[in-house]
Amino acid sequence: MIYEGKAITVKALESGIVELNFDLKGESVNKFNRLTLNDLRQAVDAIKADASVKGVIVTSGKDVFIVGADITEFVDNFKLPDEELVAGNLEANKIFSDFEDLGVPTVVAINGIALGGGFEMCMAADYRVMSTTAKVGLPEVKLGIYPGFGGTVRLPRLIGVDNAVEWIASGKENRAEDALKVHAVDAVVAPEKLQEAALDLVKRAISGELDYKAKRQPKLDKLKLNAIEQMMAFETSKAFVAGQAGPNYPAPVEAIKTIQKAANFGRDKAIEVEAAGFVKLAKTSVAQSLVGLFLSDQELKKKAKAYDKQARDVKLAAVLGAGIMGGGIAYQSAVKGTPILMKDIREEGIQMGLDEASKLLGKRVEKGRLTPEKMAQALNAIRPTMSYGDFGNVDIVVEAVVENPKVKHAVLAEVEGHVREDAIIASNTSTISISYLAQALKRPENFCGMHFFNPVHMMPLVEVIRGEKTSETAIATTVAYAKKMGKSPVVVNDCPGFLVNRVLFPYFGGFARAIAHGVDFVRADKVMEKFGWPMGPAYLMDVVGMDTGHHGRDVMAEGFPDRMKDDTRTAVDVMYDANRLGQKNGKGFYAYEMDKKGKPKKVVDPQAYELLKPIVAETRELSDEDIINYMMIPLCLETVRCLEDGIVETAAEADMGLIYGIGFPPFRGGALRYIDSIGVAEFVAMADKYADLGPLYHPTAKLREMAANGQRFYG
């Protein structure tokens, strides 16, 4: 053994060839943490010191090669002073460069996935052999940063600027054939042939058949582009990528600027340019929010996994109520491998559900994400029915009938009589109390909420709601089924609106106040979209439906009369009373026309302004910042209350619920992380400026205490 560490070993194989093997002890995957980097430095030094070494192959002892840097270390690292962070980055980069500069040929064998720092390690080798099932990529932009271990330097010198920009700016994972096509790897072989192919390559390089020094040299030199070629490549790509990423996600464009700045430098100077830009991005609130979001998502997955032991296996599911929602649930279950019965009392409901599932499956086939055979398989897994005949075999039933307590009570009581005693029944209610709905059941312990968000196939969140009598088995089984469907479940306790709708309606309340104070709803939409929301409040209400919004607001007003009851006539009342229900009937705040693709396109309708005139109580001169605060303060404060009331257990779950459920701007990290970014004391002071707008704007006593003590939601 030439070197043995806790993450890396180096052993002699044959004829002067050594194997540098990544196998991080106590972990299921390899990652670049401090320990691994330290091991790599010592391993490279050991290889350099051994005169008998003629070639190196790099392998992984795990099912994946290296998943990237250890993101849990980012939070503390990114707090370091700039100079210290740059120095640490350059120190790490020297390890990769020392490996690249070894006086012998190096070949890396890529199995599973090699992402971020994992793929940057691969690029430091002379040759790359990749398994047919492996994937490679540089996903750092998804964390608000760009590659920091030489990725912006080596990749453009390996595969050309255009290809490198596409890989880095998109952050996508690339399959073996695509990597080979652009020369990011040198060979692709079957997984079982990987070691053999790597050994063959290194032997050919040792014998002189392959000139490894000539292969290595372009990575050490400046980019082979003249000034005109550089201008054409970089200026065009910057404009295109800026349009794609938008102003709130600077990392993709900064990556291109870094490649451009370093284009005329050799490797070492180019890496210094990369390090300076990397640190600049690491210090942005966007990077801090996106790194936090990643860690919160990991926490969410961990919490969901903790329920696995208590969960019963769901082999057959059922959905009550077909239509668009039922069809979406059936599609999601079937396409992820769980057969499902889809029951409705009307044939047209069944047909609508089947049409929805067929449409969604057809789109996947069109995009090449599903074969026609798999589509047929998924469709066959959806069994339409108008009776309860087969419900005796069902493990879980999702009730998705109309949002009416009486109807739901009747349907729930009825289905309970047709399922096994241990079957779980879940309601897809968006606002009605689970404990109240459970009153219709003989076995309330087997009942919980399972709230999907529209459109089901696109929205990652499922709220799993615990009622007063819900058992842990019911929660665990529902969480496991949601995960099986490819969703991100968040367990919440029962209250009107649960987590997401309870938080969303105060946001709409803020919007109603803005309109009452003379704000043009089109302006409000533009301001909130610029803030980062996928759509503004007026457009969102049109998409949700004025009838749904009106009903939801009444439920919330009944549940929280002290702050959500509004005796004044609001914009939603006006639209609802005028039968302007939104997209569903072609008129709401906006009017809707069909575009060439048959999708509703919003247009400004003067009649909407006429209808709203009588409810403008006073015209206030409100800035864009005021408009943002009118809506964001109530949303954030209600999220705080949900955490304080124990509706949701952690800040991470609250924030991820909003990001996955209503499209809260990811780069802002969620409502509680947004408060942290402003500062708790500063946020409280800001809310106090709007105190005259009512109780929705009044911070809780506990939040004031946090402000006084300098506390945060995230350490």
Swiss-Prot record:
Its pathway, per UniProt, is: Lipid metabolism; fatty acid beta-oxidation
Q: Which GO terms describe its cellular component?
A: fatty acid beta-oxidation multienzyme complex
Active-site positions on this chain = 451 (for 3-hydroxyacyl-coa dehydrogenase activity)
Gene (UniProt): fadB
What are the cysteine partners in each disulfide bond?
none
GO terms in the biological process aspect are: fatty acid beta-oxidation
Q: Which PANTHER family match?
A: TRIFUNCTIONAL ENZYME SUBUNIT ALPHA, TRIFUNCTIONAL ENZYME SUBUNIT ALPHA, MITOCHONDRIAL
Site location (Important for catalytic activity): 120, 140
Q: List the EC numbers from the record.
A: 4.2.1.17, 5.1.2.3, 5.3.3.8, 1.1.1.35
Record keywords: Isomerase included?
Answer: yes
Q: Which family does it belong to?
A: In the N-terminal section; belongs to the enoyl-CoA hydratase/isomerase family. In the C-terminal section; belongs to the 3-hydroxyacyl-CoA dehydrogenase family.
Role of this protein? Involved in the aerobic and anaerobic degradation of long-chain fatty acids via beta-oxidation cycle. Catalyzes the formation of 3-oxoacyl-CoA from enoyl-CoA via L-3-hydroxyacyl-CoA. It can also use D-3-hydroxyacyl-CoA and cis-3-enoyl-CoA as substrate.
Tell me what this protein is called. Answer: Fatty acid oxidation complex subunit alpha
**GO MF entry, a single one:** delta(3)-delta(2)-enoyl-CoA isomerase activity
State if DNA repair is listed as a keyword: no
Reaction(s) catalysed by this chain, per the record, are: a (3S)-3-hydroxyacyl-CoA + NAD(+) = a 3-oxoacyl-CoA + NADH + H(+); a (3S)-3-hydroxyacyl-CoA = a (2E)-enoyl-CoA + H2O; a 4-saturated-(3S)-3-hydroxyacyl-CoA = a (3E)-enoyl-CoA + H2O; (3S)-3-hydroxybutanoyl-CoA = (3R)-3-hydroxybutanoyl-CoA
> HAMAP family attached here?
FadB
The superkingdom of the source organism is Bacteria
Region listing for 3-hydroxyacyl-CoA dehydrogenase, in residue ranges: 312-715
Question: Binding of substrate: at which residues?
Answer: 297, 501, 660
Q: Which PROSITE patterns match?
A: 3HCDH
**Assigned keywords, A-Z:** Fatty acid metabolism, Isomerase, Lipid degradation, Lipid metabolism, Lyase, Multifunctional enzyme, NAD, Oxidoreductase
Q: Which InterPro entries match?
A: 3-OHacyl-CoA_DH_CS, 3-OHacyl-CoA_DH_NAD-bd, 3HC_DH_C, 6-PGluconate_DH-like_C_sf, ClpP/crotonase-like_dom_sf, Enoyl-CoA_hydra/iso, FA_oxidation_alpha_subunit, FadB
